[in-house]
A protein has these predicted regions:
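Regulatory and interdomain segments flanking nucleotide-handling catalytic cores
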Residues: 1-243
Length: 243
């Protein structure tokens, strides 16, 4: 946590702050331009600060997921946003293609392992032993939502107990963004436009999810006797990525 006098130089509330603050005020050390499509685009005044933040993020993600890793691309800022945007995305493609696969430490021959992941068992609940990844996933799922028990979600146990997994990804979002941004070259205009576009995409998809859930809840009494349990479990609803 930064001291109050320094926090004003690190701008993270990208939906609310001045999109040109970093460009106009040299005391601003860092500013999030926008977050969208699973990526965060950030301006840093100094390379050392960029390195420190990325180290913190990598450790934070590892501690809270155990099995995910952070991919980071860095390019030098110019005055042409369009060229910089293309350059950093090209660098990210290169990084992802060449970065080593980061995996948690596996089990030694004398260790008990998780039957699903193969990772060492590290935790014990009242009912079972868990690996670190399984423990973190369970902690992330609210205890009040019993849709984690699949039998509670089906309409009937037996022949009609099949569950479906739906994954929706806005595959045309990249083209939409590219078409929108290809004629914008200044950072001020580009950041403002990208922020509005990212918020619009996120709001539209979340609104669609909410409407879908309302519809499913409305028809639940017609297809299931016990309506105390939902017919669905929302796993991910972030931007244009829904599961």
């Amino acid at each position: 946590t930064l001291p109050c006098e320094k926090s004003k130089n690190y701008l993270t509330e990208w939906k609310d702050d001045d999109p040109e603050a970093f460009l106009k005020d040299s005391s601003v050390e860092m500013q999030i331009m926008f977050i969208g499509g699973g990526n965060a685009y950030v301006l840093f005044r100094r390379g050392e600060e960029c390195q420190n933040v990325n180290k913190f993020l990598a450790e934070y993600i590892l501690n809270r997921t155990y099995s995910l890793s952070l991919a980071v691309a860095v390019v030098k800022k110019t005055e042409n946003y369009s060229e910089d945007y293309n350059a950093i995305n090209e660098e990210m493609r290169r990084i992802k293609a060449s970065m080593p696969l980061s995996m948690p430490m596996g089990a030694m021959p004398f260790m008990a392992v998780d039957s699903v992941t193969g990772y060492p068992l590290t935790e014990k609940t009242r009912e079972e032993y868990l690996c670190t990844e399984a423990k973190l996933k369970r902690e992330a799922f609210p205890e009040t939502e019993d849709e984690k028990i699949f039998d509670n979600m089906v309409t009937e146990k037996g022949d009609s107990s099949t569950l479906a997994v739906f994954h929706i990804d806005g595959n045309s979002m990249g083209k939409k963004i590219k078409d929108k941004m290809q004629k914008i070259h200044t950072y001020g205009d580009a950041v403002r436009t990208m922020r509005a576009l990212s918020i619009d995409i996120s709001d539209t998809f979340l609104e669609t999810v909410d409407e879908t859930k309302k519809y499913i809840d409305s028809i639940a009494p017609r297809v299931k006797k016990d309506t105390s349990h939902k017919l669905y479990r929302e796993i991910i609803a972030a931007g244009d990525d829904i599961t």
